[in-house]
Amino acid sequence: MAKRTTVLFPKTIELLQEFGENLRLARLRRNITSALQAERAGISRATLSQIEKGSPSVSLGSYVQVLVSLGLERDLLKVAADDELGRKLQDAGLSVRKRVTSRRNK
């Protein structure tokens, strides 16, 4: 069986790289070494390096572990919290249900 590869949009790659860079900067601002950060997050230094480069092959769970170990987990809750477009689409799709009365033969 051939190995499936996922094709990523350029925007996706750009977002992951920026996210990884933001995590790296957060670590450096706290004067935390990569070895200590990896230990706190429960991941290997190689995985942390991949995260800080924005690798799409690293699991979301590992990214979250780094966020938690940096005290930034609340930022994750902001993702898609205010889905303005989704709410507009939902509101546009809402319709008033009308009851259908059944005709009974009496």
Identify the role of each PLM range.
Residues 27, 38, 67:
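The alpha-helix within a helix-turn-helix
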Residues 31-49:
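Short alpha-helical DNA-recognition segment
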Residues 23, 34, 45, 60-63:
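Helix-turn-helix DNA-binding elements, focusing on the entry/boundary residues of the two helices
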Residues 55-68:
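Short, basic-rich loop-to-helix N-cap that marks the start of a DNA-contacting helix
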Residues 5-29, 79:
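A short, Lys/Arg-rich alpha-helix, primarily the initiator
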Residues 77-106:
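Short, charged recognition helix plus adjacent turn
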